[in-house]
Amino acid sequence: MGNEASYQTELCNHFDQEEIRRLGKSFRKLDLDKSGSLSIEEFMRLPELQQNPLVGRVIDIFDTDGNGEVDFHEFIVGTSQFSVKGDEEQKLRFAFRIYDMDNDGFISNGELFQVLKMMVGNNLKDWQLQQLVDKSILVLDKDGDGRISFEEFSDVVKTMEIHKKLVVFVEHGQEDLKA
C-alpha cells in the first residue's frame, strides 16, 4: 500500500493525513487475503454496501484500471468523492456514472433500464419499468436526442440536493466507514 501519509498530496483528495491513516486501517481490515486490493466479496463487507443493489456499479467506478478489484489508491480516490469537503460537481458526476454504464457521457434508455432494474429487482414487471424509463427520458431529455446528458441529469438532481447525502464520514476513534 505504500506510505499512507503521501496519499493526501499525491492524490489531491479531500482527506487529511489522519483520515487517510484511518481509511488505510479500514482498507486493511477489509482486505482479508492481504492482496493489497479489495475483491467484490471483500468490498461487500462494508455494512453500507451489503444491501446496496448498485454495489457492482460502485466497484466498477472505483476500479479505474478495470482489473476487477479496488486497490488502496483507487479506494482513496473513490471514497474521496464522498468526503464532506468534496464538491457538488464530483458527487453529481459519480451519481451520473452509476447510470452511464458505457461511460460515453450520456444515459441511454437501455442504461437507465438496467440500473433501475438493479434497484427494483422483480418488484416491477419489465414492461412497467420500461414505461417508467421512457417517461423519465421524455421528461429529462431537454434537447430531444433520446438520452440524458450530464447537464440534463444535474439540472434535476441538484434540486434534490443529493450531493449532500453522498458523504462518507471518517470519524475520530472509530475505524469504520460511515455513509
Curated annotation (Swiss-Prot):
Ca(2+) 4 binds at D141, D143, D145, R147, E152. GO terms for molecular function: calcium ion binding; calcium-dependent protein serine/threonine phosphatase regulator activity. The keyword DNA-binding does not apply. Its main location: mitochondrion. The record marks M118, N122 as: Interaction with PxVP motif in substrates of the catalytic subunit. SUPFAM superfamilies: EF-hand. A lipid is attached at G2 (N-myristoyl glycine). Disulfide bonds: none annotated. Residues 131-136 are annotated as: Calcineurin A binding. It comes from the Eukaryota. Forms a complex composed of a calmodulin-dependent catalytic subunit (also known as calcineurin A) and a regulatory Ca(2+)-binding subunit (also known as calcineurin B). There are three catalytic subunits, each encoded by a separate gene (PPP3CA, PPP3CB, and PPP3CC) and two regulatory subunits which are also encoded by separate genes (PPP3R1 and PPP3R2). Interacts with SPATA33 (via PQIIIT motif). This is Calcineurin subunit B type 2.
